[in-house]
Each structure stands twice: as structure tokens, then as C-alpha cells.
Amino acid sequence: MSTFIRGPICGTDNCPSRLWRIIDGRRTCQYGHVMEGDVEFNDDEDDLNGLGAGVITRRLNLTTNATGSFQSSQLTNSQLLQQQQRQSHKKFKKLIGHEAKLLFLKSFQFILKRQIRWLITEMRFPKEFEHVAKIIWLKILKTINDQPQEELKLQLHMTSTISILYLASTHLSLPVYTCDYIKWICTAKMPYFQASEILPKSWRIQLPNYYVSILEGSISPFNGQLYNKIALTCGMIHFKEFFNSEISCQGLLLKLVMQCALPPEFYFYTKQVIEFEETDIRNLTLWERTDERHTGRVSNHAELRVLSYFMLTINWMLSFDRDRQYPLKWILSLTESLTQRTTTSESIGRNIVKVVYPDKPTSSDYFQWSEEETLEFLKWMEKQFLPTQTKSLHNENGSMEMTIDQKIARRKLYKIFPLDREANHDGEFNDSTHQLTFIEDLQERYAKQTPFFESNKIRDSLNYQEANPPARKEAIGRLLTHIASQLLVDFAISKEQLKDCISRIKNACLHRMN
């Protein structure tokens, strides 16, 4: 029987003892309580030559962790993890059935509230936005509650949160569109990816793994998934019956014209084409869909119809102009400006969306980035993306479930490759270089177009000779291809979907002309 050794508090039945000794290989406090999981033996053979009898001894090894508490040196990491999991499962157990669905709805609402708070504080959305989003969410809950319990289907995903936010902004006629929400979630500014990490710890432990995976937002919406979800949400709550369903078409047109640095008159050209086909621009409203199995035609979505009108207007105006008002050199210069690599907030955001967007053909663009674009992407990866995938190194509140030993090991791991900006003296990540804003970049792009129109006025006073039609047609085709490639990424649709929508709108316009 060994002597007493001072150690951690026993705690069994509120036992205050700190004195421990070994009785029959088991660590026992002075009041007779046995410490669980702390029996260990040293089975190493002694020097048989030195011990004539060849006796094999078994010695008890006492080790302590970072806090000075006793622990077994022979317990593997998996055994320690199992002990911790058994202790945590005593407090929280996975919910099943109806209780699990209620907790999922509660968690979904918690994430939605965080997203709304971010939009109001960071993007300066009006305070009424929260009230409208709350009403839409309550209508969804009422629809779910009205279903029979035997056939209850939640039909909620992380894209459902974006749908609710988009519907609320549409009702308030805010100049915010799906491309904005896609950019915010892909750049990890708005809570979306790994959104389950912001839930309280007790909720995450009790929530079944199936629901946790839903709240993780594994990939960004693509191939028109967001538009289909918006249409389903509209049909679920009969959005048009209670809310304003007209999209801010003028704001979207202005956004497209400025993004492509087109002359301002293209805004009015496109608006006239829309009014010719739709009779009234206010007829562009959200589409409601109730059938989950059939997605319907992509041309039913109002925003995609505006994109199609915009592309058709550019094609028709430049094709019938015949080098009079918009010369061939200007078309070539505009195409070059769209492909030129500029380090602006918009270009960096589009590069990030291309990386996050699951589209294989865009992967070749990564090798064409400039050094500034690459550094900006790496900075975003460090500051925005990595914290959503793993708990931050300095965020101790987010890692309360980790033991002190695990925290110490994590710090040592991060010190192998320090990412601290202050430790880098080479100046490679220096932020002193000025980054052009969207307005400054737009002013430069418009300034470069001025000489082409001035020279065109001088040429009009002379004898006019029509430019080479095949060369002009090819240049227009390249311009439309570059504009379409940007729209595919910004609005998260496929090339086939955009082609189908443009074809249907074109046929409808030609049929109306006849």
C-alpha cells in the first residue's frame, strides 16, 4: 500500500478529498472512492541477466496533464476522446423524431436571424427588413404546421434562408438581386457556409447529424437552384397574394450597364425592348411554383428574363448599327476591358465566386490571375474562409469543448507555420498599394472609350464606308461571350439555361413583331 499523493479533487458524491494512494493497482482517495479509467501497468521486461530469477515486474506509472491532474500514459487519444464523449453524452443526447424537427426549426431561425442582423448592420438594410422577413418566416412555419404529422416535410435548406431574404428585399423594392446574395455567401461575408458552427453548443450536440449537414451549406447554389427555391417558397406561402412581387427592374438594368461599361443609352434601349414585349415593365414579377418535381422553364424567372433582354439588345443594336455610332474599334476595346485583369473589390469578389462556384470550365482562369489578384485571394482565404472551416486560433470561446492539452497542441501546430502578418518582413502582403473602387474603375473604363466616339464623329462628316461585316460580327460574338461568362458566374446559372432563356425571349419578340 503506497503513501498518499496530493492530486485533483475526487468529486465523487461531492467528495472534497485531494489525497490519493494506490490500492491493488487502483487509484483511491482517502475516503475510499476509486478513480475510473486510471489503472495502468508497465509490462516492460526487466534485464533478465541482472535478475537471476527472471522476475517480470509490473510498475504503476503516474502521469499528469497540463493542469496537474492524474492521467494514464497508456490511454490513447481515441480512448481519451471516448471518455470525453461519454461525459458529454451524459449531459446531452441526440434528439429524434418530432423533438429533433423542432430543434432544427429553432436552429434554422437562429441562423436566419444572424443573416438578417448582418444585412442590417453591414449592408445598411432598413430596419423594416427584419419585420418583413419575420412575417415571411412565420407564414412558412404556418404552412409546415398545417401539414399532417404523418406526412410532415420541412423542405428547408440553407438556400431557403437566401430565398426568405430575397423575398423580403423584393417586397421592399430594394435594389438587391440574387447576384448580390450569391456574392455575399461565396465570399463568406454573410453566414452561410458552416452556419451550424454559430449555433449554441448544446444545440449542435443534440441536433441529429442529418440536420447538421443541412445547416452546413456544403456548396453554393448553382444551375439555377436558387431561382427554383425562390419559386417554391413563393408558391408555398402564396407570396403574390400578400406581398409586392415586382422586381426592381430599373436597378438591375443599371447594374448590368455599369458592370459592362456600356454607354448609358443601352439602359433605355433595353427598357424599350422590355416594354415592347412585356407591355409594362412592372409585369416582371416573381414566379410561383408548387410542383417540386418539375422545375419549369428557366425563362419564367423575372431576373433571368431581364438578362435575356439585355443580351438581345446588345446584339441587335450593334448588329444593325453597321459601324455608324458604335465603331468596330470600340467593340474590340470594350471586349479587351472586360477581359483585362484589374484588382478591384468587384473583380476580387468575382474571382472568389468562381472558385467557390462548382463549375469545372472556369478552373483554367486561376492560372491567369495577376500577382495582386492572387495575393488578394490568399488574404480572403486566411481572413474569411478558413475561420468558417475551422475554429479560429484566437477564439477560445468557440473551442470550449477542447481540453487544455488539445488547445496547447493546436497552438504549437499553428506555430510551425506562423500566419501572422507582423512576422512577415518581406513586405509581400503590404496593403499600402491603393485598390481601385468600383466607381474609380468605371470612370477609367469610360474615359478610355471617349476617343473612339470623338473620332467617329469626325469620320461621319467624311465619306462613310461600311466596315468589314464578318469582322464586326465576329467581334460582337466575342463581346457577347465575355458578357455571358460574367453573368453565368454572377447569377449562378448554367450556359445551357442562359441560352434557352435568350432563345425563348428572342422568339417571343420576333413573333410579336410579326
From Swiss-Prot:
Residues 37-66 are annotated as: B-reader. Zn(2+) binds at C10, C15, C29, H33. Residues 211-320 are annotated as: C-terminal cyclin fold. InterPro entries: Rrn7_cyclin_C (IPR048538), Rrn7_cyclin_N (IPR048540), TAF1B/Rrn7 (IPR033599), TF_Rrn7_Zf (IPR021752). Residues 67-101 are annotated as: B-linker. Present with 398 molecules/cell in log phase SD medium. Component of RNA polymerase I core factor complex (CF) that acts as a SUA7/TFIIB-like factor and plays a key role in multiple steps during transcription initiation such as pre-initiation complex (PIC) assembly and postpolymerase recruitment events in polymerase I (Pol I) transcription. Binds rDNA promoters and plays a role in Pol I recruitment. After binding of UAF (upstream activation factor) to an upstream element of the promoter, CF is recruited in a SPT15/TBP-dependent manner to form a pre-initiation complex. This is RNA polymerase I-specific transcription initiation factor RRN7. It comes from Saccharomyces cerevisiae (strain ATCC 204508 / S288c) (Baker's yeast). The lineage of its organism: Eukaryota, Fungi, Dikarya, Ascomycota, Saccharomycotina. The gene is RRN7.
